[in-house]
């Protein structure tokens, strides 16, 4: 057990929260720069069509995100508990298993993605020049799936080991390289009408570098985990999939959720509602990243102490993270609710749209203050290996309740239902999350 892991069992919960969460939050914010910078540079250097093409491609990049999250979160949860138990056998097997599944699943994503990328883009309405540009961009992204998925999933394993700063530095390296390469390759390749390919290649090259740096660390530097061979470990694999599936579902089901939000907004409110929804979801996504980063800090803290059967510390750590997540959410929620019109105006909305958008945004964003509760409880269940509770929460929120409610209620209540329904659903899920957490900790002995 390394020094970082021992500290998870001895440091005060507040110090653990600061040590693990700050680097994780910064690291997650860095990850958020990839799609953001691609879009900004494409719009400035290649034009509106290129920016739109990258935008419509983004939902399908969640296939890779889902795979990386499935393997990374599942493996990270197992590792954290193994550290608490000092299970050296798991230390030897965890990376071999991760490499096996990254290789197999990335190969599947690459083949299917390249074959069906154009059809997928057509399904969401891309056509003409935008369809052509988006297909050229997305095909390259799918081709680099192996490097993307290894870089991201192995980084989660670093966090599971409690090495948040190291994980952050490696992610920052990848993001920084992407930001540098993006404009350079777009400018260099736009003269041969391949600027959009330059954007995709920049992203993949950055991930390749991050993947090789990560590989080097685990191969030669890590004191806990070593890369020995590519091998499926049946026992570990079952638990990786059981635990990781709920985290993967959050990524993949977001595609379904956002597709319904957009389609219903356009159907009942036209282009104006669609524009408001686009601005609102961008703000929500940006606000969500720090909470997700904090949850990455919670996972090894809970997992390690749970594995060591330090149940009182598990409760104290969760309490500190929960309260901190509410405070973190408030940092975004308060200014967003006070300066809504100024915030929405950054997205170029017209004055008329801003009048309606201000009210709709405040309704939609109203429950964000409680998002930390929802995310921390979900991460808690993942960390202790309770895949059933974690999976049920995700499926209940994003499919079972959300889909029928968003389809049926607007039929009777019109456009207003599209903005009111999601926060009501979130309140319900937050209450259920708290109930399941209390029920679970009562079983700790």
Task: Please provide the spans of the model-predicted regions.
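Short alpha-helical transmembrane segments in multi-pass integral membrane proteins
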Residues: 1-21, 79-144, 191-245, 302-367, ...
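Residue-level hotspots within pore-lining transmembrane alpha-helices
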Residues: 30, 34, 64-68, 108, ...
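Hydrophobic transmembrane alpha-helices of multi-pass small-molecule transporters
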Residues: 63-66, 178-183, 211-215, 285-289, ...
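N-terminal transmembrane alpha-helices
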Residues: 8-45, 59-74, 78, 103-110, ...
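Small-residue-rich hydrophobic transmembrane alpha-helices
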Residues: 51-111, 148-167, 276-334, 338-340, ...
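Short runs within selected transmembrane alpha-helices of multi-pass transporters and secretion channels
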Residues: 72, 141-159, 167-175, 199-214, ...
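Helix-terminus/linker motif at the lipid-water interface of multi-pass membrane proteins
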Residues: 33-51, 121-128, 184-194, 255-286, ...
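Transmembrane helical elements of multi-pass membrane transporters/channels
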Residues: 19-38, 140, 174, 206-210, ...
């Amino acid at each position: 057990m390394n020094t970082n892991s021992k500290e998870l069992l001895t440091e005060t919960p507040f110090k653990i929260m600061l040590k693990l969460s700050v680097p994780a939050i910064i690291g997650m914010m860095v990850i958020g720069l990839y799609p953001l910078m691609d879009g900004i540079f494409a719009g400035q250097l290649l034009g509106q069509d290129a920016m739109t093409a990258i935008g419509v491609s983004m939902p399908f990049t969640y296939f890779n995100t889902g795979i990386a999250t499935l393997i990374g979160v599942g493996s990270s949860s197992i590792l954290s508990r193994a550290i608490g138990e000092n299970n050296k056998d798991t230390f030897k097997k965890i990376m071999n298993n991760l490499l096996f599944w990254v290789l197999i699943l990335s190969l599947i994503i690459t083949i299917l993605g390249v074959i069906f990328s154009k059809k997928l883009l057509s399904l969401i309405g891309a056509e003409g020049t935008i369809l052509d540009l988006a297909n050229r961009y997305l095909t390259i992204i799918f081709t680099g799936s192996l490097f993307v998925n290894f870089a991201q999933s192995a980084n989660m394993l670093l966090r599971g080991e409690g090495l948040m700063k190291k994980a952050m530095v490696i992610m920052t390296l990848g993001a920084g390289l992407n930001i540098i390469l993006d404009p350079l390759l777009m400018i260099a390749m736009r003269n041969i009408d391949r600027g959009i390919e330059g954007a995709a290649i920049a992203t993949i090259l950055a991930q390749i570098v991050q993947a090789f740096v990560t590989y080097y660390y685990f191969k030669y530097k890590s004191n806990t985990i070593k890369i020995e061979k590519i091998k499926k470990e049946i026992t570990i694999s079952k638990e990786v999939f059981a635990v990781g599936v709920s985290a993967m579902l959050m990524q993949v089901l977001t595609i379904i959720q956002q597709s319904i939000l957009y389609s219903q907004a356009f159907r009942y409110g036209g282009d104006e509602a669609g524009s408001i929804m686009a601005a609102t979801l961008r703000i929500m996504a940006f606000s969500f990243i720090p909470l997700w980063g904090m949850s990455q800090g919670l996972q090894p803290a809970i997992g390690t102490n749970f594995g060591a059967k330090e149940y009182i510390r598990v409760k104290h750590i969760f309490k500190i993270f929960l309260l901190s997540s509410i405070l973190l959410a408030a940092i975004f929620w308060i200014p967003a609710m006070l300066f809504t019109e100024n915030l929405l105006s950054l997205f170029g909305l017209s004055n008329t749209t801003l009048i309606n958008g201000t009210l709709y945004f405040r309704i939609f964003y109203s429950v964000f203050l409680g998002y930390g509760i929802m995310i921390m409880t979900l991460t808690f269940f993942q960390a202790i290996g309770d895949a059933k509770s974690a999976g049920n929460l995700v499926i209940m929120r994003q499919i079972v309740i959300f889909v029928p409610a968003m389809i049926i209620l607007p039929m009777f209540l019109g456009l207003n239902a599209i903005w009111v329904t999601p926060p009501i659903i979130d309140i319900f899920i937050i209450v259920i999350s708290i109930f399941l957490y209390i029920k679970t900790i009562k079983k700790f002995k």
